Amino acid sequence: MNESTVYECLKYGNENINRALEVLRAGKMIQIYDSDSREGETDLVIPAKAVTYKDVKWMRKDAGGLICVAVDPVASKQLKLPFMADLVREASRTSESLGEVVEKDGDLKYDSHSSFSIWVNHRDTRTGIPDLERALTIRKIGEITEKSLSGNGIRFGNEFRTPGHVALLRAAEGLLDERMGQTELSVALARMAGITPAMVVCEMLDDESGRALSKENSKDYGKDHGLVFLEGQEILEAYMLWTGSEC
């Protein structure tokens, strides 16, 4: 399917998706809700390359969850980013206690495996935790993701150190054909938008209940702040159009 046909499919398929893609191309924030049958959580989502310290502050104060960067599966391979569970599994060969805590089949109630990779700071940071420093680390993750996809030879360790304060998430190789987490949903949107597929995600939490912010309250927040609210199913349907599976 050529680009113009894909554009027409998306243009007339879902106006909400079209708005979200335009917002992401402008480097701004949107909301993504995965599904009622999965985590049942809404994330604030923004392209990594566009993040400022004010965005980190916004996510930290208004969302309250972990501030993570979801990385495209092709870039993850190029950068040799491991899954955290695999690292712990390897380390458990010499540490029995690690073997007891590493993620096992059936541990997760919402999916088959976690997408967590390593936690990093950029080497130009001091402690890595202030909003300015986390924003720097996040932008640099976006930049190195873009470089890795352009075929440039890159050594991830030249720019980053671990442990750090920004969690990396490895998107599943098959993206939405394989997994419907916020990681894959945000990276799929980045691909559709034609932007670097490194996306910041942060769960929205509820101060009153101590749980994830409900879908309705998340929508209300979005309306108050002018954010596009997307659900996982509509992203999946648009992604199927974009990949040419349906049109």
UniProtKB/Swiss-Prot annotation:
Keywords: Lyase, Magnesium, Manganese, Metal-binding, Riboflavin biosynthesis. The record marks H165, E203 as: Essential for catalytic activity. It is an enzyme of class 4 (lyase). One of its GO terms (cellular component) is cytosol. This is 3,4-dihydroxy-2-butanone 4-phosphate synthase. It comes from Methanosarcina acetivorans (strain ATCC 35395 / DSM 2834 / JCM 12185 / C2A). The lineage of its organism: Archaea, Methanobacteriati, Methanobacteriota, Stenosarchaea group, Methanomicrobia. GO terms for biological process: riboflavin biosynthetic process. Binds 2 divalent metal cations per subunit. Magnesium or manganese. It catalyses: D-ribulose 5-phosphate = (2S)-2-hydroxy-3-oxobutyl phosphate + formate + H(+). Disulfide bonds: none annotated. D-ribulose 5-phosphate binds at R38, E39, D43, R179, M180, G181, Q182, T183, E203.
